[in-house]
Structure formats: structure tokens, C-alpha cells
Amino acid sequence: MTVKEELTSSEIANLWTAYIDNSAMSIKLKYVLHIMEDTEILPIVQKTNQLSENNLIQFNQIFDKEKYSAPIGFTDSDVHLAAPRLYSDSFFLVFLQNKMDMNLNAYSMGLSHSTRSDIRNFFQQSLAASIEIFKEATDLMLEKGIYVRPPYIPTPKTVDMTERQNFLTGWLGKRRPLTAIEIDQLFFNISRNALGHALLLGYSQVAKLKEVREHMRRGADIAKKHIHLFSSILLEEDIPAPMLWASKIEDTSVSPFSDKLLMFEVTGTTQAGVGYYGRSLASAQRRDLGAQYLKVLTDSILYGEDGGNITIKNAWLEEPPQAINFRKKVKG
């Protein structure tokens, strides 16, 4: 007799999260496909949309098989195809490349945290597809001259071992130059914040509710503050920093998306940012860098909490699957 292998809590968590994320992406790409004019970028958008659509089909098959209620996610009511262009085509290319970067983290975790072979296969296939789209988007950005390369530093000719405690010095005493690892983290934190700054500025123009517009504007200000902070650290050592994307935003007040979708995307991006900052904090070996990452982490966590309160207040937040509350059962 074959015993049915139930989904583990980790598998449920990653499937549930990925379902809502793919649902949001599928709806957003309907608008992008509608307004996309660049014939070189269009195939990448189509391939990304196909990935989201295929994933949603597989999610529903898994949930039906397990007799598990699928999340609501997002529907056609969350997109306004007649809305005018909000961002340039090149901005959407950068956005999709960044989204695939986030997929690499999410799907690799889904793969490594899954036990059942069918769930592992699903995340493996989604990861492979995301890698291909990421590569294609990056190659096209390079061709179009909009990919900003990380800074170059001299290639090391010898291997040195750290022998002095001042390697960790940051506030007092003579500071050592930034390591390649620290430059990498600073550079990509600036790049992600530059994209987020433009995204939030655009959303602050078109969101319907005042509290959502104000939340977007505040997020744009936080992103700009973080950009200036990280850029100043690089520029202090004559290392170039990436530029902002604000010039890619169009002048419109008509939103292509519901406030619910806007808040979901910004909340998800903020959560990802907290994860990136945590990784940067762990890799920072100069004390001043660690202190700065703690500050920006606090900014992001508090901002994310405020965003969560807005989504709860407006009944936009679906509750993730939860464990049984045995204490409540006993009291009942």
C-alpha cells in the first residue's frame, strides 16, 4: 500500500508565496504587453509572461490534487489596460531583469526546502526558466547600453592574510580601502534602490488612495536616502556609483494597477530589500559599514510594517497558511 506523501509546511509556504507572486506578475505583464513598443524587449516580456502563466497552471494542478484551496491572488480587476504609459520600455526591461534576480533567490530556496520530488522538479524548472530570462534581459541591457557594470578594481597578483585588527576599523583610526565584497554589496544595493526609487515615484503619481500615495512617496524618499548613503561611501574612495532612473517616468496620474497590486509589489520589494541588507550586513567587515547597514535595515523594517498595516486596513492581505492553534482549541 502506497502512503500519500503530504505537503510539508515548507512546501506549502513556498508554493503559496510563489502562487501570489506569479499571479501579480501575470496581471502586471498584461499591461506591459499592451503598451510595449520595443520589438527587442517584447520577446523577453512574452517569455516572462509565459513562465508566470505556466506556473499558475501547475500551482492549480498541485492544489487540486492536494484538495488545497488556492490563494485568491490577483485578477483582471487589478489592471487597467487603457491606462497611459507610466514607464519607458527600457525601464520595464531593467525591472524584469531585477525580478528574475529575485526569482533566483525565491525558487532556489523553494527547491532546497522541498522534500517531494514533484515539488522539487517544479522549482527546478522555474529556476532554470528564470535563469534563461535573466541572461537574455542582461544581454539586451548590455546591447542597449543601459546595463551599469560594477566598478573595476585592480586584479590581485598575490594572496595576503590579514594580521592586524585594524582591518575591522571603521570609525576611528585609519580605515582600510573597501574590499571587493563590500563594493559589490554597496553597488547592487544602490542599483536596486535606484530602480525602487523610480518605481515608487511612478506609483506615488497614480495611486488612488491618499495614504497609498503618501506611502509610495515616503518609500521613494527612503530609497533616495539610502542611495546617497551608499554612494557617498563609494565616492569617498573615488569609486563610481550608479545613477537614478527618475527620467524614465512618464507624466500621468492614471494608474494601470489597483492600489492592492501596488501595495503588494512594494511590500514584497521591501521584504526582499531587508533580506539583501541582512546579507550585506553579514559580509561587511568594516565596523562603520555594519553600523550603516543596521540603520537602513531599521528604516526598511519600519517602512514595511507600515505598508503591512495599510494592506490589512484595506482588506488586501491574504493570510498565509498557519499551524493549528492548539491553545485556542483547548480553551474552546
Q: Each predicted region: which residue ranges?
A:
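Acidic/histidine-rich alpha-helical segments that form the ligand environment
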Residues: A13-L33, A83-F122, P177-Q205, V254-K295
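Acidic/His metal-coordination segments adjacent to aromatic residues that form catalytic metal sites
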Residues: M1-A13, I72-L96, V159-Q185, L244-T267, ...
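Generic structural signal for well-ordered, non-transmembrane alpha-helical segments
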Residues: S23, Q46-E53, I57, N98-D101, ...
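Alpha-helical scaffold segments that form or flank carboxylate-/histidine-based iron centers
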Residues: S10-L15, T39-L51, F92, S117-I131, ...
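An N-terminus-focused feature that recognizes amino-terminal "leader" regions
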Residues: M1-E5, S10-A13, I27, H34-F91
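Acidic, low-complexity, intrinsically disordered peripheral segments
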Residues: T311-G332
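Conserved alpha-helical segments that form or flank metal/cofactor-binding pockets of metalloenzymes
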Residues: T39-G73, I131-R149, E211-E214, R218-P242, ...
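Hydrophobic, ordered structural segments
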Residues: I35, F95-K157
